[in-house]
Amino acid sequence: MCGIVGIVGHKPVSERLIEALGRLEYRGYDSSGVATIFEGELHRRRAEGKLGNLKTRLKEAPLSGTVGIAHTRWATHGAPTECNAHPHFTDGVAVVHNGIIENFSKLKDALAEVGTKFQTDTDTEVIAHLLTKFRRDGMGCLEAMHAMLKCVEGAFALAILFEDDPATIMVARNGPPLVIGHGDGEMFLGSDAIALAPFTNDITYLNDGDWAVVGKTSVQVFDIEGNVVTRPRHISLATADLVGKGNHPHFMEKEIYEQPEVIARALGHYINVNDSHVTTTSTDIDFAGVESLAISACGTAYLAGLIGKYWFERYARLIVEIDVASEFRYREIPLSPRSAALFISQSGETADTLASLRYCKAHGLRIGAVVNTRESTMAREADAIFPILAGPEIGVASTKAFTCQLAVLAALRIGAGKARGTITDDEEQVLVQSLATLPGVMRQVLNDITPEIELLSRELSHYRDVLYLGRGTSFPLAMEGALKLKEVSYIHAEGYAAGELKHGPIALIDENMPVIVIAPHDRFFDKTVSNMQEVAARGGRIILITDETGASMSKLPTMHTIVLPDVAEIIAPMIFSLPLQLLAYHTAVVMGADVDQPRNLAKSVTVE
């Protein structure tokens, strides 16, 4: 959500700031802006809509200056208008902000009482006015910054310019991530390392509560009490070439087709094909001594965790508690120190998931983080890190991160079963060999089913409501398929457990309701066929996704049947996710939707 970049340099920065913002577009936004200091004065350009609109403004009215900040805004307080776009200016101060100031109404009222006039509907403007007030009260820039931070409550990442201090940018972090990049005679800042990849890979990650003064050749970091602190520098693995589309029209399509490659890389970290065993690392959780397991995540990551719940319960005989992170942390769950917790997040910065992680850590649980970004806050705060190694995922709708999360959870399920004595050596070998076939089968399926999915998507695009059904691990897949379709095509879709059909959804079924049934030939197949018969009896349009054995056994007429190869149970969820992803993608393309940046959505939700 939102993106922040800044440069303290020795040459003009406006074009480089816009270039860096382009690498943050995946985070979601609805307006953008840039500000620089030139000849002792602040200057800015802002625009509603896509970044191209801001580029046009800059062509019409270029900005000079070697120090500047820029921002992509995802509206939380105030409509997505140019007036509400960042940076916000008050006398001698420019502010960009990612997050939510929870006490802004109280602060706004207090400022209004002393004559402050507000120009926007945003919470961010409060920050600028506080800084201006403290400066007028006689405080220096550093003192005013510290005083402001003691006033505001909520989640925020900030970058601030002062006209009186034209050679620095002041920054702060409390929740949303903020990184500092060390260059050659210049310094950079951004919401993540990807934004800075063409400029530097020498990165300092700020901790929650940190604030800093960034100069041309150095950064001084303070904690919330104003004490100088030292934060380590890291070499980031993010590179600029990882965020291109290649030969694909959209990032989402590129990332769908990258899955065989990234799955192979992920599995290589967790299984040893030569001796058919899962690998152990120094960060493994000791599942043998764990009484129960808690899993928490948001969105697609939660659905990966739900599949993980089925696996850990059935094959490791673990009691598993799972909930969406926004609910998990408020339920006051009885937690035992002999329990462990897994938190799943592509970015490793998801606000609700991070809050749930901290809740469990405070209760003494051992924490595992299944993340795509090893330098993320969740990874740094966890006891055990389980990287999914998917590489940067730019499309807002998660595809390759989802299947990599499943691959990692599948390997962990084997390791947990071995540790707890519920999986034998022979069973481990069979499971590992099955996992090893996954990249090749994925590649085959993507090649085989794409043409028929393209045709089916044209028909599906004419409907406004779609129901997805599944049993067992296919139930979370049904919810994931529905989520993908609604995210990128804006078609209303819901995923249900097939056994719940008679408890409500069946009332909606008629000839205008496509019903996508996910039915591998497993122990649930016959019951799922019974549900399909109920749909057919009411005129529902069945789209069946099954395997070769299932297709040979189902005699019901369908609108379309997608036939996948027979595969081992452990890799079936990853294989069956592919037609769901492709169907959502191609339907959205047919409908002319913005596939990579769906309306109102953000890739990384860093506020609650």
From Swiss-Prot:
Please name the taxonomic classification of the source. Bacteria, Pseudomonadati, Pseudomonadota, Alphaproteobacteria, Hyphomicrobiales
Q: What does this protein do?
A: Involved in the production of the root hair deformation (HAD) factor specifically on medicago.
> Where in the sequence is the active site?
C2 (nucleophile), K603 (for fru-6p isomerization activity)
Q: Name one GO molecular function term.
A: glutamine-fructose-6-phosphate transaminase (isomerizing) activity
Catalytic EC class: transferase
EC number(s) in its UniProt entry?
A: 2.6.1.16
Instruction: Name the NCBIfam families for this protein.
Output: glmS (TIGR01135), PRK00331.1 (NF001484)
Q: What organism is the protein native to?
A: Rhizobium leguminosarum bv. viciae
Domain Glutamine amidotransferase type-2 stretches: 2-217
Cite the entry's keywords alphabetically.
Answer: Aminotransferase, Cytoplasm, Glutamine amidotransferase, Nodulation, Plasmid, Repeat, Transferase
The chain positions of domain SIS read: 283-422, 456-598
* InterPro entries documented for this protein: GATase_2_dom, GFAT, GFAT_N, GlmS/AgaS_SIS, GlmS/FrlB_SIS, Ntn_hydrolases_N, SIS_dom, SIS_dom_sf
- Location within or outside the cell: Cytoplasm
The GO biological-process annotations, alphabetized, read as: carbohydrate metabolic process; fructose 6-phosphate metabolic process; protein N-linked glycosylation; UDP-N-acetylglucosamine metabolic process
PROSITE patterns for this protein: GATASE_TYPE_2 (PS51278), SIS (PS51464)
User: Could you tell me what this protein is called?
Assistant: Glutamine--fructose-6-phosphate aminotransferase [isomerizing]
Q: Which reaction does it catalyse?
A: D-fructose 6-phosphate + L-glutamine = D-glucosamine 6-phosphate + L-glutamate
Gene Ontology CC entries for this record: cytosol
